[in-house]
Amino acid sequence: MIVFITSDLMMASNASAHAKQQGVKITQVSSAERGMEVVKEDRPHLLLVDLQCPGLDIEALGASLAKLADSISPLTIGFAQHVETEKLSAGRNAGFDQVLTRGQMNSQVGQIIAGVS
């Protein structure tokens, strides 16, 4: 299972199409608060985070993820446009397992999701 925090419908649609092909359930939410609720309830294998999601506090999300027990802590991948260097750095500093540019995410999303199935 995957939780995807994004308000970008194109990214969500692309990820959903790949997840469907792989037979993986994906839940898209538009806030970190809702994302954390779903993570705690459903214990996904992967959390995808659009670091450019409006209102997202990257540091607070990282702190919330760090508090999770290892048994429910998902692999966390954040992404943002390559010019958003502060957001990319914030994702790294927040302890995300991987931080990608939006272009990398677009080209690798199928492989990333296949790794969950």
What are these regions (language model features)?
Residues V49-L65:
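Conserved phosphotransfer microenvironments
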Residues Q104-I112:
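C-terminal output helix
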Residues G23-S30:
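Short hydrophobic/Thr-rich beta-strand motif most characteristic of the beta2 strand and flanking loop
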Residues V83-Q98:
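Alpha4 helix (beta4-alpha4-beta5 surface) of REC/receiver domains from two-component response regulators
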Residues S30-L46:
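Acidic, metal-coordinating helix/loop segments flanking the phosphotransfer/catalytic sites
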Residues M1-L9:
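Conserved acidic segment of CheY-like receiver
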Residues D42, A66-I72:
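Conserved phosphotransfer cores of two-component systems
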Residues S73-V83:
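A short, hydrophobic beta-strand element within the central beta-sheet of small alpha/beta folds
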